[in-house]
């Protein structure tokens, strides 16, 4: 099973992925957790280029780098793991491309769909958990985590984190539009709930999905 987590930066994905992976391992499942961009030697190098704040990358260049990283991850790690019967949990997948590069950067959505199909080989998650939070609240969380003042020009932020509030508002709208188009694949969760409450919702939803597949 392929499980993906989506949401704007600061929504709490990493915490929930860790908790879900621990739960599934206790249930006897073999679990592999991965992140995008990253997950292979080549993809991790691409991640460094993408997030390094001193790099000035065009929207199309950014898109192609994300796509290259994804192609490596899917081919080298994700598909082999799924073939071995493992449960793969991905911190971001192609929905991030649509939301961030499509809605956030304003790139053509049809072009994105073509690149997504090429980079994933049409691989689609069995379920996607979307943690929804207002950009204003998410960014306060991110700045607080890094003990930084609320200023987007701060050099301690990575390149994506410095994109600004309006960018993240567009990204969130992108996610909402994606979910409206594919409601069956998504479970949208209010990220303002407590950590344990969100985890309980995820576990309940996933167990129901396991039953459907058995």
Curated annotation (Swiss-Prot):
The keyword Kinase applies. It comes from the Bacteria. InterPro entries: P-loop_NTPase, Thymidylate_kin-like_dom, Thymidylate_kin_CS, Thymidylate_kinase. Keywords: ATP-binding, Kinase, Nucleotide biosynthesis, Nucleotide-binding, Transferase. GO terms for biological process: dTDP biosynthetic process; dTTP biosynthetic process; dUDP biosynthetic process. Its EC number is 2.7.4.9. GO terms for cellular component: cytosol. CDD domains: TMPK. ATP binds at residues 7-14. It catalyses: dTMP + ATP = dTDP + ADP. GO terms for molecular function: ATP binding; dTMP kinase activity. It is an enzyme of class 2 (transferase). Disulfide bonds: none annotated. Belongs to the thymidylate kinase family. Phosphorylation of dTMP to form dTDP in both de novo and salvage pathways of dTTP synthesis. This is Thymidylate kinase. It comes from Chlorobium luteolum (strain DSM 273 / BCRC 81028 / 2530). The gene is tmk.
């Amino acid at each position: 099973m392929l499980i993906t987590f989506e949401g704007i930066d600061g929504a709490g994905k990493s915490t929930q992925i860790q908790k879900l992976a621990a739960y599934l391992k206790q249930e006897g499942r073999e679990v592999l957790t991965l992140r995008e961009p990253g997950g292979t030697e080549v993809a991790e190098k691409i991640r460094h280029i993408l997030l390094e704040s001193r790099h000035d990358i065009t929207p199309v260049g950014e898109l192609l780098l994300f796509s290259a990283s994804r192609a490596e991850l899917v081919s080298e790690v994700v598909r082999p793991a799924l073939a071995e019967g493992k449960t793969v949990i991905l911190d971001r997948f192609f929905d991030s491309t649509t939301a961030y590069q499509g809605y956030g950067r304003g790139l053509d959505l049809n072009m994105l769909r073509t690149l997504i199909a090429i980079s994933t080989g049409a691989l689609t998650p069995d379920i996607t958990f979307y943690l929804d939070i207002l950009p204003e609240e998410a960014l306060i969380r991110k700045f607080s985590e890094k003990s930084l003042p609320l200023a987007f020009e701060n050099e301690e932020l990575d390149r994506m984190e410095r994109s600004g509030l309006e960018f993240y508002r567009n990204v969130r709208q992108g996610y909402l539009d994606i979910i409206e188009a594919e409601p069956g694949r998504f479970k949208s969760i209010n990220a303002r709930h407590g950590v344990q409450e969100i985890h309980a919702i995820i576990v309940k939803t996933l167990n129901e999905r396991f039953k459907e597949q058995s």
